[in-house]
Amino acid sequence: MNKSVVRVGDYCAEATPHFCISGSNNVFVNGKPVCRKGDNFTEGRVLTEGSKTVFANGLGIGRVEDIVSCGFKVIKGSETVFAG
């Protein structure tokens, strides 16, 4: 099932959300850098999951419902770009 792609500025579901603050320097979705597995979120968190079939710079791209190291899922992503 395809899920919305996560970009810099998108966030997780924790009560105080963590935002993606780093991403690809040359792969963009809706004009924003794509957030990939291992990219940074606020407060020292990182994206711990990513696509196993779609990559940016050799790293799995983040999608809505992937997990951040705080233990919560990403809930905000692109409204027009999706990946498996």
Q: Predicted segment positions?
A:
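Intrinsically disordered, low-complexity proline/glycine-rich segments
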Residues: M1-G84
